[in-house]
């Protein structure tokens, strides 16, 4: 009677793949017959759950981890796996992707300790890795911003980052990430201008044609200053006295993030694709990195991380048709609000959930000094119009209003708006009104700004 093959607790890798009985000897008889002696080694086994906290050196030989090099190679490969869509809508999937990338990308938070990211008592980092002055000279190029500081020191290639961003930004992602593109000239034109005229600083600013003040300290009446030559940069605070019935809808068909259509029929017949928030979130991150230090960036990203699960729960079942319907609702609501806001007379600004300004009325332009062309013809974010402290408060307020409290409104007691002239701010009290779509996602934020005259 022939001897039977004795079973062993650990099979070799060849027998394990074939699901056959193996022997304790190495090489086993099966591998010898097939000429596989060189690869006849114990198959790696998974670590038991009850041994998860036991160091490798204290484990028995049979349950120790397999080839460490293979595991590290597998881990490195997984880091570069493309984002797998988890939403039924491509637009929603891209928006979630950029939110995840902002929070987890290597260019921002990989070198930041987890206790600093999730603990509000973490130690402050004295070394600022980002520029804080709001000047064009301090804004780094896009090529430099696409890499973390450590990568710039070691000269690591940025091709993988560009491929990752190009995937998230859609078909035109590679074009948007070219090195020669001046991101902050194209998308962020709101850099304050220096006022070098000393006489312009000392005198009361007004427009003699409409005989009205600026919102600042007043020492005399405009009629007394009629003989003073008005400055070309002066901005009138006079309201439009034209009849509301004669007012036409000021739509901008070439600006996708603003009011594009003048009638509801155009909205329902011409909108055939959803609005992409992805490029807006990406550009917002680039702008914040050029303006704030590391500690502020971490705090803002913490706010983004808090509402990400809520976004997943709401958007996971949305289809592409749902996202198109969202944009139709946005344009239809904006068209309706345009008629209402024009008669209200309160400085008002409307922006999307990624912060892109999509509508301003005449009173807001008169209050801040920024024209509609400045704010709407390029990608402009509401945080560009605020001072640093107001921007920090913005993310906390947005997180609270948009994804926690459903009362629909919030008040910022103090919000300082920046003007085209460096060093000049307008202190306001701001009321936020949040408009949600039928699915519960934040659709738009309507901000009403009332100047605090005594402190302007």
UniProtKB/Swiss-Prot annotation:
Residue ranges: DNA binding: 12-40
Pfam hit, one: Zn_clus
CDD domains per UniProt: GAL4, PAS
Main localization, broad class: nucleus
Keywords annotated in UniProt: Activator, DNA-binding, Gluconeogenesis, Metal-binding, Nucleus, Transcription, Transcription regulation, Zinc
Top-level taxon of the source organism: Eukaryota
GO molecular function: DNA-binding transcription factor activity, RNA polymerase II-specific; RNA polymerase II transcription regulatory region sequence-specific DNA binding; zinc ion binding
Keyword Transcription regulation: yes
Residue ranges of the region described as Disordered: 123-160
Gene Ontology terms describing biological process: cellular response to starvation; gluconeogenesis
One Gene Ontology CC term in the entry: nucleus
Similarity remark: Belongs to the ERT1/acuK family.
Role this protein plays: Transcription factor which regulates nonfermentable carbon utilization. Activator of gluconeogenetic genes.
Name this polypeptide is given: Transcription activator of gluconeogenesis ERT1
Organism: Lachancea thermotolerans (strain ATCC 56472 / CBS 6340 / NRRL Y-8284) (Yeast)
């Amino acid at each position: 009677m022939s001897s039977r093959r004795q079973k062993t607790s650990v099979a070799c890798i060849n027998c394990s793949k074939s699901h056959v009985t193996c022997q304790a000897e190495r090489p086993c008889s099966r591998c010898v017959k097939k000429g596989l002696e060189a690869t006849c080694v114990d198959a790696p086994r998974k670590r038991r759950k009850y041994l998860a906290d036991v160091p490798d050196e204290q484990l028995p030989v049979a349950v120790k981890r397999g080839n460490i090099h293979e595991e590290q190679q597998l881990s490195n490969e997984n880091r570069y796996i493309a984002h797998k869509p988890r939403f039924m809508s491509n637009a929603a999937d891209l928006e979630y992707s950029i939110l995840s990338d902002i929070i987890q990308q290597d260019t921002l938070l990989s070198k930041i300790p987890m206790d600093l990211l999730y603990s509000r008592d973490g130690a402050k980092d004295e070394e600022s890795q980002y520029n804080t002055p709001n000047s064009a000279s301090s804004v780094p190029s896009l090529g430099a911003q696409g890499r973390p500081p450590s990568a710039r020191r070691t000269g690591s290639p940025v091709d993988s980052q560009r491929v990752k961003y190009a995937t998230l930004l859609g078909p035109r992602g590679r074009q948007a990430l070219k090195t020669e593109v001046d991101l902050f000239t194209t998308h962020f034109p709101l850099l304050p201008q220096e006022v070098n005229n000393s006489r312009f600083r000392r005198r009361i600013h007004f427009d003699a044609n409409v005989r009205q003040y600026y919102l600042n300290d007043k020492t005399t009446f405009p009629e007394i200053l009629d003989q003073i030559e008005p400055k070309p940069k002066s901005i009138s605070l006079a309201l439009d006295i034209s009849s509301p019935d004669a007012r036409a809808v000021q739509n901008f068909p070439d600006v996708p993030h603003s009011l594009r259509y003048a009638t509801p029929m155009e909205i329902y017949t011409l909108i055939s694709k959803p609005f992409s928030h992805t490029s807006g979130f990406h550009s917002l991150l680039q702008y914040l990195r050029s303006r704030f230090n590391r500690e502020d960036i971490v705090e803002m990203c913490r706010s983004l991380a808090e509402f990400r699960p809520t976004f997943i729960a709401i958007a996971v079942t949305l289809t592409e048709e749902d996202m198109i319907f969202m944009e139709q609702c946005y344009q239809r609501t904006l068209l309706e609000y345009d008629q209402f806001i024009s008669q209200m007379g309160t400085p008002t600004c409307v922006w999307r959930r990624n912060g892109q300004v999509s509508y301003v009325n005449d009173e807001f332009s008169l209050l801040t000094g920024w024209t509609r062309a400045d704010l709407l013809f390029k990608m402009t974010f509401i945080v560009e119009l605020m001072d640093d402290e107001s921007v920090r408060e913005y993310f906390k307020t947005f997180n609270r209003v948009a994804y926690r409290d459903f009362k629909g409104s919030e008040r910022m007691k103090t919000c300082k708006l920046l003007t085209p002239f460096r060093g000049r701010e307008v202190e306001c009290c701001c009321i936020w009104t949040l408009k949600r779509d039928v699915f519960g996602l934040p659709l738009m934020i309507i901000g009403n700004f009332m100047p605090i005259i005594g402190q302007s």
